[in-house]
Design a protein with these regions (language model features):
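Nucleotide-activated donor-binding/catalytic signature segment of Leloir-type glycosyltransferases, i.e.
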Residues: 242-243, 251-279
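Carbohydrate-associated surface elements
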Residues: 167, 188
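Nucleotide-sugar donor phosphate/pyrophosphate-binding loop at the beta->alpha transition
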Residues: 109, 121-124, 132-157, 191
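Conserved acidic donor-binding segment of nucleotide-sugar-dependent glycosyltransferases
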Residues: 330-331, 335-342, 351-357
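Conserved donor-binding/catalytic core segment of Leloir-type glycosyltransferases
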Residues: 4, 162, 200-218, 224-227, ...
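A short, well-ordered alpha-helix in the C-terminal region of glycosyltransferases
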Residues: 344, 351, 358-373, 382-385
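Acidic donor-binding loop of glycosyltransferase active sites
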Residues: 266, 282-300, 314
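Short hydrophobic beta-strand element within catalytic cores of glycosyltransferases
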Residues: 287-290, 308-311, 315-318, 335
Length: 390
């Protein structure tokens, strides 16, 4: 028995937050006795067309290593991957019966494609929803209407929907989607990755942010401004930013901000690092920080980086946006503050540094959540049971 994780909204085995969530799903399914096949449907030029990691079989049906200079050939490659995927899915189902497909896509055409395949092969289809469906359709009423229509149609082209937040459950329920089709799966984390304490990769104390360097979504600019406030009181602490910016514009803005605040020798941009390197950076940080601003993205989602932060037992300073306050309480298992305010965020960072022994005790309380609510094995079993009800 197996589960296929399919989509064009992630890379694998290396990638971003979606990739990490898929790794946790897959590990949980495998430990519960279910085989996992990951099909990356994106048009990505990759040296590996297929492989296996930690018992997870993965495939890239696009299958091209280099980009052709001819448009007709590129179009042909994009077209033929649909037949390759169909053939691949049939082979998997024949040798390792598929109980369900878990789809990860924001494209209505891609969702329609996998829906038709699932119906043809008679496999249940469960969609993943980790972000606000209308986040890219803000502005005019016509844009919002287009987003609403696409969201509604996409939600009809599946048997079930896994929602990362209660907000998304209510969003779809308010639009006529039956509640029995909706299932809450909060952020998940593989705690085993963070249990082994390794030597610090850096030779100094540091506050750390790990993730895509975004301004509107994760407020990296706010974090930099907050660090500027505390940097004079703590001259031996650096700010380390792991990841790359989502746009060239954001990359330029963030690096210019660091320069303008005279922090070039205090803020470290590591760039993208491998998934295996992340735990050593997180577990050796002084503080793990996330200054996420209030936004439509924050309202509906829950940052996967936060559950990774929690699993380390390192003090966390985070803004109280979206459903973060549902799970975390200021001074109980993390340190929360209001969003969009560098001064207040800096005050909370300073408080943790000034009361570090107590902060470690609070961090250990937060760590307990990763053994229960956010535990990958527990949530994978819940997903399996939900699929059986469809």
């Amino acid at each position: 028995m197996s589960i296929v994780i399919f989509g064009d909204d992630f890379a694998f085995p290396e990638g971003d937050a979606a990739t990490n969530r898929i790794h946790t799903y897959a590990k949980g399914f495998i430990e519960n006795g279910i085989h996992v096949h990951v099909i990356c449907f994106a048009n990505v030029y990759n040296a590996d067309t297929a492989g296996s990691i930690n018992g997870i079989n993965y495939y890239h049906p696009f299958g091209e290593r280099t980009r052709s200079k001819f448009l007709i050939i590129r179009t042909w490659h994009k077209f033929t991957k649909h037949f390759k995927t169909f053939s691949l899915l049939l082979r998997i189902h024949k040798s390792d019966p598929v109980m369900a497909i878990n789809s990860w896509t924001q494209s209505l055409t891609c969702q329609l494609y996998i829906y038709l395949l699932a119906r043809l092969i008679r496999i249940r289809l469960v969609s993943e929803r980790s972000e606000h469906p209308l986040r890219k359709y803000q502005g005019s009423s016509s844009r919002i209407m287009v987003g609403e229509i696409k969201s509604y149609l996409g939600s009809k082209l599946c048997d079930g929907i896994l929602c990362i937040s209660q907000y998304l459950i209510e969003f779809y329920a308010a639009r006529g989607i039956k509640r029995k089709k909706l299932f809450l799966v909060p952020s998940t984390v593989d705690t085993d990755r963070f249990k082994i304490k390794t030597e610090s990769p850096l030779q100094y104390d540091y506050i750390l942010y790990c993730g895509t360097l975004t301004i509107l979504k994760d407020g990296v600019d706010i974090l930099i401004k907050s660090f500027a406030i505390l940097s004079k009181r703590f001259p031996d602490i650096q700010l380390v930013l792991i990841g790359k910016a989502n746009t060239l514009e954001n990359d330029t803005l963030l690096k210019r901000l660091v320069s303008d605040l005279h922090l070039s020798d205090r803020v470290v941009f590591t760039g993208q690092i491998s998934r295996n390197e992340v735990p050593s950076y997180l577990t050796n940080a002084k503080i793990l920080a996330l200054a996420r601003p209030a936004s439509i993205v924050a309202e509906a989602g829950f940052p996967s980086k936060l559950t990774e932060y929690l699993s380390t037992g390192i003090p966390i300073v985070v803004t109280a946006v979206g459903e973060i306050p549902v799970y975390l309480k200021d001074g109980s298992n993390a340190f929360l503050c209001e969003p969009d305010n560098p001064e207040i965020f800096a005050e909370k960072l300073l408080f943790v540094l000034d009361n570090y022994s107590n902060a470690l005790d609070i961090a250990r309380n937060g760590q307990k959540l990763t053994e229960t609510t956010f535990n990958y094995r527990f949530q994978a079993k819940r997903i399996e049971e939900f699929i059986k009800t469809l």
